[in-house]
Structure formats: structure tokens, C-alpha cells
């Protein structure tokens, strides 16, 4: 039993992060504190000053933990990371929280690759972005691929290395095949330098030279060649134009405002580059009606800029935000030069901020309208489903199950959940098959259903014993309907498992046609055809697609992990991180065997003792 009185007494007089948990051990809130002792104790003092949301949270706190940090800045960074990790119920959650994509050029390689990534790291490579418009970054990448035949493989290719056979991309003119030695490092880097200059927007000589080439081709009546050069010029100009929107310069500014209704809110950001609004983003934030605007915007800024690497010099907000000095310091460290958060009182900047707020209202209204429309469509589909199956009530919560394996290897089971016709990702579960050997879908399904309902009954008993509220996101909430991604056989397995546990839940299966498309439902040993294009068929298709996607994704992740399990696991001093670094650098076990001591030491994370261990292992 957690001793609140004792734990509150021994709280340190230092900065840090506190983590609130409920009776099932779930993290429900993460907060930072300048002084942990003062901040945490506030929650358990007179609740009259607390908002409804805070009072509800305090009721659910069964225990708390804390992490002491050296500074308030460290506490802020740790808080951001923990919120992203746990997505606690009572923290402000951005509906569209994400890391923005960058274009990465692996300049620490002899023959660099150019690709899109959402992971920014100070690793010596070149990054361009972040691109707040996800579509734009892929358009830019598409144009780069069209203009420059670069390699896309992950092979460790070094100049003068042993050549390998060129892949299909070489034969269709999409790659110059440095792996086969068909292009020198110097020639390849000419293309890379051009790309860097185009993305930087710093070199106009490329277009000038191309225009001269085009004019010369036209004079010599080589119109086809001239047309190709013209298309190349247009593509480069288009890339440069798109890049302007995402290049943060000294005088650039972001404008952030918030609009809330009686329950939820929308945060809107306008990006102003060279005095023009070049882009915008909006984020829906749920259940913030009781939260002060200054707190919401403060949390939003920490979360929003925590996911990007480039920050403007000035950010305009409607009022002074909570911990403004600390947030400015956090952003300044991230940017590398001073960042200001300002409140415009009048003039153009105030007018623009008003426009941001108006747009936030419009986006929130549209979001709510779409939600209502979607809710009606989903309800209609659930009514149709209940009617078709003859259920007494709407199947508000549907659980769907699938098994995935390739020739019996890495068998996995997955459970996806739909509530009120919408996917509820937080309740998804995945199971690695333990007791079944070989490709046996029926027995694999029996195992995962048994594990699911066994866990569920244990939780239900625990909740009843402690007189607790049912918690969301665990096994204790049972479905109104189970949907099997298979026919009569899988339905019967599910019914047998439920009978063993003494649970009554209706179970249906999906019947497919010759083209493996769902044509109907099997229920009570009868096949029921569903009209194609109906709301019910759309719902069933969404459920089926989602359970397939989730199963395949999990299966692929297990397969990839298994592939990485190699002979390297037997080498002393070589852990998972070092294995990955070795495979990324050398591409294969054979190349690692042939590597010199100097090449091994040049691998990230490989010290002298690890390199000696590798050499000794392969020479023995």
C-alpha cells in the first residue's frame, strides 16, 4: 500500500519531474516542478482551488514517483519526453502530435543517400527541413529522384571497395551503380553538391548553365534534348520555391493562438517567412475547457517545437504564457541563438494573431461538424450490424482478431478495437504465439483468445476486490461483439474459449469470395450477405483492413529483429546497438570479416577492445 503521508514528507526541495499513476500502475499525469516538494503537495491540499479536471485526476492517483533533475530546464525536457512516451490521460494531448519530416543526406558516406526521415540527429549528416507540410517533402524528394540517379540501397559502399552486381535501378537509369564501380566518388559528389545547393537555394549558376545548354540545343535543332533540359530547369525551380517555405531565417516568425469551446480547443500556427504567411498547422486538443490559456499554450509550444529542429527567432502569442522565461531558454538552446516569445498589443502583428485565432475557430468548428457527421454514419452502420445479427443492443465495442505467419515462422496474433465505429488504437494488443509450433491458425487463435480473456478476468476480479473504477486501455473491458477474420472454424474456436471461461459474447466471422474480398458475415452458422457499398460493409472493411495492417506490421517487426539476430550475437562485447552499427556500416557479415582494424574502429560505438574481440572471433 502506497504511504502518501510519508512520501509527501520526504519529497526533495529540488527541481524534477513527478509521475502520477492509477491503481493499475498506468501513468495518468506527468508534470515538472521547480521545487518538487511544493508542487506535488499542492495536489493533495484543499481541492477548492482545483479545476474539475485536476479534482478528477487526484481521485485516480494511487501512487506517484519523481525524478530529481539538476535544473528546471532538464525537468522540462524530461517532462516532454515522458509525455510523448506515456501519453497520459490528464496531460494536454495534441490530436496531431508528430515529428516533422526532414530530407537527410548521408554526407558521412563515400556515396551518400538522400531520403526522408522523421529522426533528426547531430550525426555529421546534412538535414533539410523540417517540412510542416508532409506532402511537400515527398514532392521535393520525387523531383530530386527524377533529376539525380542516386543510390537508394543501404549497402556500405566505399570507393575502391569490392564491386558487386548492379541492381535493377541501374538498368532503368535510376541509379549510377556506385556498388559496381560505374561512377567515381568525385562524379557522384557533383550530384550531391548540386542537391545541397538547390535545397539551400544558394547557387543560381546551375539554372544559368542549364539555360545556356538549352539555348545551345535549340540552336542546333536538338529540340528533344532542349525539352528535357527545360523540364530539368522547371523541376529545380519548383524545388527552390518549395524550399523557401521551410527555410528558417533570422527575421522569421511564428504566430500561435488558441480557440476553445465548452470542451475542446484548436491551436493554430501561422509560419511567416520573409514577411509572408507561407504555411500553417492546426492541432486539436481535447478536454481543456478548465485549463488556463497560458498553461495550454505553454504546453503546446514545448510539445510542438520539441518535435522540430528549427525554431524561428520570434514567436507571437495572445498572452504571457506559463514558464515563459524557461520556455524561451529551452527554445534558445535548441535553436542555438536567442528566441523571443512576445505578446503583440496593436498593429499588423496583433491583427495577424487575431486572424490566427479566427482560423483556429473555423478549424475547430469544421472538426466538430466532421465528428458529428462521422458519428452519425458510424451509428447507422452499428444499427445495421445489430439488426443483421439480431443483437439486443448496439455493438459499441468490437474486437477483431487475426493470425499472421509465413510458413509457421514468427506466428503472431493481434487484437484491434473499434468503439462507436472508430478505431481505438490505445486498446490494440498483440501476442507472440508461445504454445503452438508450426502453422496452425486455429490453435494459435485459441491461445491468444485464452490469454486475452484470462488477463481480463484477473483484472476484473482485482478491480472488484479494491472497489475501483474500470480503467481504460486494459483487458478488463470486454467487447459487445467479437469479429474473427475467418470463417466458421475460427468462430467455433472463439465460442469454445468463451464457453470455457463462462463468458457470453456474440461472435461473427467474415466470409470472403473467390477474389478474397469480404462478401458477408457468418453468424450462428448462417452466412449473411452484406450489400457492397453499404455503411455496414464500409465498417467491416475498415475493421478487416486494420486488423490485417496491425498483424502484418507486428509480424514484420519480429521478422526484422530475427534477421538482425546473427553470428554477431556470439561475439563478446558486441551488444544490439553495436551489431546494428556494424551491419549499417558494412552491410553483411562477410564484409565485417574482411574489415581492417582501422575500419572497425571507424564504426560508431566500436572501441579498441570491441574491435579486437571481432578480429579474434573471426580468426579463430
From Swiss-Prot:
One of the entry's Gene Ontology molecular-function terms is: DNA binding
Keywords, alphabetical: Cytoplasm, DNA damage, DNA excision, DNA repair, Excision nuclease, SOS response
Ranges where the UVR domain occurs: 204-239
Q: Which family does it belong to?
A: Belongs to the UvrC family.
According to the entry, every stretch annotated as the GIY-YIG domain falls at 13-92
UniProt function note = The UvrABC repair system catalyzes the recognition and processing of DNA lesions. UvrC both incises the 5' and 3' sides of the lesion. The N-terminal half is responsible for the 3' incision and the C-terminal half is responsible for the 5' incision.
- GO terms of biological process kind: nucleotide-excision repair; SOS response
> Where does it localize?
Cytoplasm
Task: Give the chief site where it resides.
Answer: cytoplasm
Name listed for the protein in its UniProt record = UvrABC system protein C
This chain's source organism reads Clostridium perfringens (strain SM101 / Type A)
| PANTHER family membership | UVRABC SYSTEM PROTEIN C, UVRC/OXIDOREDUCTASE
Q: Give the UniProt entry's GO cellular component terms.
A: cytoplasm; excinuclease repair complex
Q: Which gene encodes it?
A: uvrC
Give the quaternary structure.
Answer: Interacts with UvrB in an incision complex.
